């Protein structure tokens, strides 16, 4: 009986290893496909609008509209490349952190203030709750700002308009705990545990502007700072 239990445990371990290997291979294939798609889409638009701007018969209003669209597509491509670069550095551990004493509540307020236009436009009612005491942590300010920004922007993209999103900051056993809750506008057709995987997006039709790397970067930056 003991031998049978041990053999079953070994078999279970092998099955899990095979399953993980297959999943890893599938993720690599999907990653390459998604990178190709997300780079190609804005790049194709840029090439198209550059060609359109070569038309000397364009009136000034149309020319300005094309230039504005060209700028938006260029910025999207720039953000995607920056996200890919950050994700690559985080995955390889080749990233520098500069810890300093931060008051997390103040940083949250600053990020929310900076993103006020975006949160208002989303139609989501953001409710931030802070503890009465200050919450000090040793963190890299720039990376932590990026974590908060990515999480909040993700809510503006995928939360159901007209609902509330809660940002709750607490201290538990000497550690800062930040909890964010919102009602999703999309039906998730994948396991919630995979939501922070690279290129996983809440909208499978990829209709929202984004790289699918925001939560993956937030997770990596959090874990690399001991969170």
Q: What residues fall within each predicted segment?
A:
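A conserved beta-strand-to-alpha-helix junction within the catalytic ATP-binding
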Residues: 98-112
